[in-house]
Amino acid sequence: MKYIEKYLDYLKVVKKYSNKTILSYYDDLIEYNEFLGNNFKNILNIDIDITKEYLKYLYERGINKNSISRKLSSIRGFYNYLVKEEILTSSPFNSIPNPKKDLYLPKFLNDKELNKIFSVCSENTPSDERGTLIIELLYATGIRVSELVNIKVKDIDRTNKSIKVLGKGDKERIVLYNNHTSRALDIYLNDAYHIFNKKNSEYLILNHNGGKLSDRYIRMIIDKLVRKANLDIKISPHTIRHTFATDMLEEGADLMTVKELLGHESLNTTSIYTHITNEQIKKTYNMAHPRAKK
């Protein structure tokens, strides 16, 4: 257990991983350590047979391939750290390949659904102004909800319509917004923001007490707008992020630009959206082409 704790400290202090990422590593490693304990094995004395047994154990529990790949990545990183620290001479997991991942196509909103949500946005009350700004910002920028709640007013460049956001691993990037978002931002800052800002907060999106709005409350605001639009769908802030990426690619944006705007580490992560656009192309073709209909 002490080696796991040392590794997690390394991820936090040296690698600068977020608390959420470190918690994911913790869960994977504790689960693995419990498996070893149940089989009377020491985490420092593992051979190829045990690694295969663990892989078999994960499959038998019905865990999907993507989750298994993540768990193996966590464990592989742990053993590579032990090799780096000269606690072990080699990693028992380097010879274990990740299972081929299942293709996961993220859910996104179509134009009709998106327009319905925007059509019920209003500025009738301070809460309405805030809700409108939240939807506008999420769709205009493609940012994560964790990035949205941490935007500070000073991070916004209203002249250039850009925002500095703090992404995963505390990495900064610049995202852009449009005229619709600019209008919603002006209305909010000139009215609702002053009503909510009872504690002289530096954050943009505030609750009624003047504190930073929570991720959970933003999800509630989105749910309320979806119900108001009479849509029988369940969406999250991440659905809007997926919609941003899909729409950008469908309208001709290149993959590298979308990658930078989303704050992805790898182009492979962004490329999942090309599968979505290809599926849409196929669907449109089959619906529209005379011979495809028959």
Predicted regions and their residues:
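Conserved catalytic core of the tyrosine transesterase superfamily
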Residues: 1-294
